[in-house]
Amino acid sequence: DWGRHVQQAAQFALSALGQAFPQAAPFTFDNTRVIAVGISNGGGAVLRAAELEGDWLDAVVAGEPNVHVDGHGSRALYDYTTEAALLMPCALLDMPAATLPQPPLLEPLQPFWQARCTSLKAAGVIEGADLAAQARSAHEKLRASGWSEQALVAGTASAGFDLWRAVAVTYASAYGRHGVGAHPCGFAFSAQNPDSSPRPATAAERGSWWSDASGIPPGNGVGIIDPKLALPDLTLAGLQCLRGFHAGPGEAAQRVQAGIAATRALPPRAGLPVLVVHGMDDGLVPEAFSSTPYLAAARAAGRQ
Protein backbone atom coordinates (compact mmCIF):
# COMPACT_ATOMS: atom_id res chain seq x y z
CA ASP A 1 0.00 0.00 0.00
CA TRP A 2 2.95 2.37 -0.43
CA GLY A 3 1.11 4.23 -3.18
CA ARG A 4 -1.95 4.79 -1.01
CA HIS A 5 0.30 5.96 1.80
CA VAL A 6 1.65 8.64 -0.56
CA GLN A 7 -1.91 9.66 -1.36
CA GLN A 8 -2.70 9.86 2.35
CA ALA A 9 0.40 12.01 2.86
CA ALA A 10 -0.85 14.38 0.17
CA GLN A 11 -4.24 14.56 1.87
CA PHE A 12 -2.53 15.37 5.15
CA ALA A 13 -0.43 18.05 3.44
CA LEU A 14 -3.55 19.73 2.08
CA SER A 15 -5.05 19.75 5.56
CA ALA A 16 -1.84 21.17 7.04
CA LEU A 17 -1.77 23.92 4.42
CA GLY A 18 -5.33 24.82 5.32
CA GLN A 19 -4.40 25.17 8.98
CA ALA A 20 -1.24 27.16 8.22
CA PHE A 21 -2.90 29.49 5.69
CA PRO A 22 -6.58 29.68 6.63
CA GLN A 23 -7.02 32.84 4.59
CA ALA A 24 -6.26 30.83 1.42
CA ALA A 25 -8.15 27.68 2.40
CA PRO A 26 -9.49 25.31 1.39
CA PHE A 27 -6.60 23.53 -0.30
CA THR A 28 -7.85 20.66 -2.45
CA PHE A 29 -6.56 18.42 -5.20
CA ASP A 30 -8.51 20.60 -7.63
CA ASN A 31 -6.79 23.88 -6.74
CA THR A 32 -3.35 22.66 -5.57
CA ARG A 33 -0.59 21.17 -7.69
CA VAL A 34 0.66 17.91 -6.17
CA ILE A 35 4.04 16.48 -7.24
CA ALA A 36 5.20 13.29 -5.51
CA VAL A 37 8.98 13.06 -5.10
CA GLY A 38 10.94 10.24 -3.47
CA ILE A 39 14.21 8.31 -3.58
CA SER A 40 14.99 4.61 -3.01
CA ASN A 41 12.00 3.09 -1.18
CA GLY A 42 10.39 6.52 -1.44
CA GLY A 43 10.98 6.42 -5.18
CA GLY A 44 9.18 3.10 -5.33
CA ALA A 45 6.36 4.56 -3.25
CA VAL A 46 5.74 7.51 -5.57
CA LEU A 47 5.75 5.19 -8.59
CA ARG A 48 3.13 3.05 -6.87
CA ALA A 49 1.14 6.24 -6.27
CA ALA A 50 1.33 6.91 -10.01
CA GLU A 51 -0.79 3.79 -10.58
CA LEU A 52 -3.76 5.14 -8.66
CA GLU A 53 -6.73 6.46 -10.56
CA GLY A 54 -8.09 9.96 -10.14
CA ASP A 55 -6.83 13.47 -10.79
CA TRP A 56 -5.24 13.99 -7.38
CA LEU A 57 -1.62 13.68 -8.58
CA ASP A 58 -0.06 16.04 -11.14
CA ALA A 59 3.44 14.56 -11.59
CA VAL A 60 5.95 12.11 -10.13
CA VAL A 61 9.74 12.33 -9.74
CA ALA A 62 11.39 9.07 -8.63
CA GLY A 63 15.09 8.84 -7.83
CA GLU A 64 16.84 5.45 -7.75
CA PRO A 65 13.49 3.76 -7.02
CA ASN A 66 13.23 0.38 -5.37
CA VAL A 67 10.58 -0.94 -7.76
CA HIS A 68 9.95 -4.18 -9.59
CA VAL A 69 7.56 -5.18 -12.35
CA ASP A 70 6.60 -8.26 -14.31
CA GLY A 71 9.23 -9.21 -16.87
CA HIS A 72 11.63 -6.92 -18.75
CA GLY A 73 14.55 -8.19 -16.64
CA SER A 74 13.13 -6.84 -13.40
CA ARG A 75 14.19 -8.46 -10.15
CA ALA A 76 12.81 -7.88 -6.67
CA LEU A 77 15.09 -6.34 -4.06
CA TYR A 78 14.97 -9.50 -1.95
CA ASP A 79 16.17 -11.59 -4.90
CA TYR A 80 19.27 -9.63 -5.79
CA THR A 81 20.05 -8.70 -2.19
CA THR A 82 20.25 -12.31 -1.04
CA GLU A 83 22.20 -13.22 -4.17
CA ALA A 84 24.70 -10.43 -3.52
CA ALA A 85 25.02 -11.31 0.15
CA LEU A 86 26.15 -14.81 -0.80
CA LEU A 87 28.20 -14.27 -3.96
CA MET A 88 29.59 -10.74 -3.91
CA PRO A 89 32.20 -11.18 -1.14
CA CYS A 90 33.84 -13.90 -3.21
CA ALA A 91 33.30 -12.19 -6.58
CA LEU A 92 35.00 -8.98 -5.47
CA LEU A 93 38.27 -10.91 -5.06
CA ASP A 94 38.27 -11.26 -8.86
CA MET A 95 38.25 -7.50 -9.32
CA PRO A 96 41.37 -5.30 -9.07
CA ALA A 97 41.53 -3.96 -5.52
CA ALA A 98 42.57 -0.55 -6.83
CA THR A 99 39.21 -0.21 -8.60
CA LEU A 100 37.16 -0.89 -5.47
CA PRO A 101 36.08 1.92 -3.15
CA GLN A 102 37.33 2.16 0.42
CA PRO A 103 36.10 2.33 3.17
CA PRO A 104 35.56 -0.31 4.20
CA LEU A 105 39.23 -1.25 4.30
CA LEU A 106 39.48 -4.30 2.09
CA GLU A 107 42.55 -6.02 3.54
CA PRO A 108 40.90 -7.05 6.85
CA LEU A 109 37.89 -8.39 4.92
CA GLN A 110 39.82 -10.61 2.54
CA PRO A 111 40.11 -13.66 4.85
CA PHE A 112 36.33 -13.65 5.29
CA TRP A 113 35.76 -13.26 1.57
CA GLN A 114 38.22 -16.07 0.85
CA ALA A 115 36.30 -18.28 3.28
CA ARG A 116 33.14 -17.48 1.34
CA CYS A 117 34.74 -18.69 -1.89
CA THR A 118 35.68 -21.95 -0.19
CA SER A 119 32.17 -22.40 1.19
CA LEU A 120 30.47 -21.69 -2.14
CA LYS A 121 32.76 -24.15 -3.92
CA ALA A 122 32.00 -26.83 -1.32
CA ALA A 123 28.27 -26.18 -1.74
CA GLY A 124 28.52 -26.55 -5.52
CA VAL A 125 27.44 -22.96 -6.15
CA ILE A 126 30.65 -21.96 -7.94
CA GLU A 127 33.49 -23.76 -9.68
CA GLY A 128 37.26 -23.49 -9.56
CA ALA A 129 40.25 -25.44 -8.32
CA ASP A 130 41.82 -22.48 -6.56
CA LEU A 131 40.80 -19.17 -5.02
CA ALA A 132 41.33 -17.15 -8.19
CA ALA A 133 39.16 -19.49 -10.25
CA GLN A 134 36.47 -19.55 -7.58
CA ALA A 135 36.34 -15.76 -7.38
CA ARG A 136 36.14 -15.58 -11.17
CA SER A 137 33.27 -18.08 -11.15
CA ALA A 138 31.34 -16.01 -8.58
CA HIS A 139 32.01 -12.86 -10.60
CA GLU A 140 30.75 -14.50 -13.78
CA LYS A 141 27.59 -15.70 -12.04
CA LEU A 142 26.72 -12.18 -10.93
CA ARG A 143 27.39 -10.77 -14.38
CA ALA A 144 25.24 -13.49 -15.94
CA SER A 145 22.34 -12.63 -13.64
CA GLY A 146 22.39 -8.98 -14.72
CA TRP A 147 24.87 -7.18 -12.48
CA SER A 148 26.95 -4.57 -14.31
CA GLU A 149 30.59 -3.95 -13.48
CA GLN A 150 29.64 -0.48 -12.22
CA ALA A 151 27.05 -1.91 -9.84
CA LEU A 152 29.50 -4.51 -8.54
CA VAL A 153 32.13 -1.87 -7.83
CA ALA A 154 29.58 0.30 -6.05
CA GLY A 155 28.30 -2.74 -4.17
CA THR A 156 31.67 -3.16 -2.46
CA ALA A 157 30.55 -0.96 0.41
CA SER A 158 27.35 -2.97 0.88
CA ALA A 159 29.37 -6.19 0.98
CA GLY A 160 32.04 -4.77 3.26
CA PHE A 161 29.63 -3.24 5.75
CA ASP A 162 27.37 -6.34 5.75
CA LEU A 163 24.46 -4.30 4.38
CA TRP A 164 23.19 -7.06 2.10
CA ARG A 165 22.59 -9.35 5.06
CA ALA A 166 21.04 -6.53 7.09
CA VAL A 167 18.51 -5.79 4.34
CA ALA A 168 17.70 -9.46 3.78
CA VAL A 169 17.13 -10.17 7.48
CA THR A 170 14.77 -7.22 7.83
CA TYR A 171 12.88 -7.71 4.59
CA ALA A 172 12.34 -11.43 5.17
CA SER A 173 10.37 -10.48 8.28
CA ALA A 174 8.50 -7.70 6.48
CA TYR A 175 7.55 -9.67 3.37
CA GLY A 176 6.61 -12.75 5.39
CA ARG A 177 4.79 -10.66 8.02
CA HIS A 178 6.55 -12.48 10.83
CA GLY A 179 6.22 -11.04 14.32
CA VAL A 180 8.83 -10.45 17.01
CA GLY A 181 10.59 -13.68 17.92
CA ALA A 182 9.17 -15.50 14.90
CA HIS A 183 11.81 -14.93 12.21
CA PRO A 184 11.84 -18.13 10.13
CA CYS A 185 15.65 -18.24 10.13
CA GLY A 186 15.88 -17.44 13.84
CA PHE A 187 17.32 -13.94 13.43
CA ALA A 188 16.59 -11.30 16.05
CA PHE A 189 17.58 -7.74 16.90
CA SER A 190 19.12 -6.82 20.25
CA ALA A 191 21.71 -4.74 22.02
CA GLN A 192 24.84 -6.86 22.35
CA ASN A 193 27.69 -7.55 24.75
CA PRO A 194 31.29 -7.47 23.49
CA ASP A 195 31.03 -11.22 22.80
CA SER A 196 27.94 -10.55 20.60
CA SER A 197 25.53 -12.14 23.08
CA PRO A 198 22.20 -10.29 23.49
CA ARG A 199 21.53 -7.93 26.38
CA PRO A 200 18.85 -5.36 27.27
CA ALA A 201 19.34 -1.93 25.72
CA THR A 202 20.08 0.94 28.08
CA ALA A 203 17.77 3.92 28.39
CA ALA A 204 20.35 6.10 26.66
CA GLU A 205 20.59 3.69 23.74
CA ARG A 206 16.83 3.53 23.36
CA GLY A 207 16.65 7.31 23.49
CA SER A 208 18.99 7.64 20.50
CA TRP A 209 17.17 5.22 18.20
CA TRP A 210 14.54 7.62 16.90
CA SER A 211 17.01 10.35 15.97
CA ASP A 212 20.08 8.38 14.93
CA ALA A 213 19.08 4.88 13.81
CA SER A 214 18.55 4.06 10.14
CA GLY A 215 15.76 1.60 10.88
CA ILE A 216 17.78 -1.34 9.56
CA PRO A 217 20.14 -2.95 12.11
CA PRO A 218 23.00 -3.31 12.79
CA GLY A 219 23.71 0.19 14.03
CA ASN A 220 23.15 2.59 16.90
CA GLY A 221 23.51 -0.09 19.53
CA VAL A 222 21.22 -2.64 17.86
CA GLY A 223 22.83 -5.76 16.43
CA ILE A 224 21.72 -8.79 14.45
CA ILE A 225 21.49 -11.98 16.49
CA ASP A 226 22.21 -14.90 14.18
CA PRO A 227 21.73 -18.31 15.84
CA LYS A 228 23.40 -20.01 12.85
CA LEU A 229 26.64 -18.02 13.19
CA ALA A 230 29.58 -20.43 12.91
CA LEU A 231 33.15 -20.64 11.67
CA PRO A 232 34.79 -20.79 9.23
CA ASP A 233 32.24 -18.79 7.18
CA LEU A 234 30.37 -16.98 9.93
CA THR A 235 27.25 -15.80 8.12
CA LEU A 236 26.89 -18.47 5.42
CA ALA A 237 24.23 -20.67 7.04
CA GLY A 238 21.97 -17.74 7.87
CA LEU A 239 22.32 -16.33 4.37
CA GLN A 240 21.53 -19.69 2.80
CA CYS A 241 18.37 -19.80 4.89
CA LEU A 242 17.37 -16.31 3.71
CA ARG A 243 18.17 -17.09 0.08
CA GLY A 244 15.98 -20.17 0.25
CA PHE A 245 12.88 -18.01 0.64
CA HIS A 246 13.37 -16.45 -2.79
CA ALA A 247 12.21 -19.45 -4.78
CA GLY A 248 12.17 -22.34 -2.32
CA PRO A 249 9.27 -24.41 -1.01
CA GLY A 250 7.64 -24.37 2.40
CA GLU A 251 5.27 -22.08 4.24
CA ALA A 252 7.89 -19.51 5.27
CA ALA A 253 9.15 -19.18 1.69
CA GLN A 254 5.63 -18.91 0.33
CA ARG A 255 4.85 -16.11 2.77
CA VAL A 256 7.91 -14.15 1.69
CA GLN A 257 7.13 -14.75 -1.99
CA ALA A 258 3.53 -13.61 -1.50
CA GLY A 259 4.74 -10.44 0.21
CA ILE A 260 7.11 -9.68 -2.65
CA ALA A 261 4.38 -10.30 -5.24
CA ALA A 262 2.11 -7.84 -3.43
CA THR A 263 4.67 -5.06 -3.97
CA ARG A 264 4.89 -5.51 -7.75
CA ALA A 265 4.32 -2.22 -9.59
CA LEU A 266 1.98 -1.47 -12.48
CA PRO A 267 2.36 1.23 -15.17
CA PRO A 268 1.42 4.80 -14.25
CA ARG A 269 -2.02 6.05 -15.18
CA ALA A 270 -2.25 7.42 -18.69
CA GLY A 271 -1.26 11.04 -19.12
CA LEU A 272 0.60 11.41 -15.82
CA PRO A 273 4.08 12.96 -16.20
CA VAL A 274 6.68 10.67 -14.60
CA LEU A 275 10.41 11.40 -14.36
CA VAL A 276 12.75 8.62 -13.23
CA VAL A 277 16.37 9.48 -12.34
CA HIS A 278 18.78 6.63 -11.65
CA GLY A 279 22.58 6.50 -11.66
CA MET A 280 24.23 3.77 -13.70
CA ASP A 281 26.68 3.13 -10.84
CA ASP A 282 24.01 2.36 -8.23
CA GLY A 283 25.22 -0.71 -6.35
CA LEU A 284 22.36 -0.97 -3.86
CA VAL A 285 19.33 -0.77 -6.16
CA PRO A 286 20.85 -1.48 -9.60
CA GLU A 287 18.97 0.29 -12.38
CA ALA A 288 19.09 -2.85 -14.52
CA PHE A 289 16.74 -4.57 -12.07
CA SER A 290 14.51 -1.62 -11.19
CA SER A 291 14.21 1.62 -13.19
CA THR A 292 15.07 0.27 -16.64
CA PRO A 293 12.52 -2.59 -16.45
CA TYR A 294 9.91 -0.22 -15.00
CA LEU A 295 10.32 2.19 -17.91
CA ALA A 296 10.20 -0.70 -20.39
CA ALA A 297 6.97 -1.99 -18.85
CA ALA A 298 5.45 1.50 -18.85
CA ARG A 299 6.30 2.04 -22.51
CA ALA A 300 4.98 -1.41 -23.41
CA ALA A 301 1.69 -0.36 -21.81
CA GLY A 302 1.55 2.72 -24.04
CA ARG A 303 2.87 5.28 -21.56
CA GLN A 304 5.25 7.97 -22.81
PLM region spans:
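C-terminal His-loop and adjacent cap/lid subdomain of alpha/beta-hydrolase
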Residues: 1-304
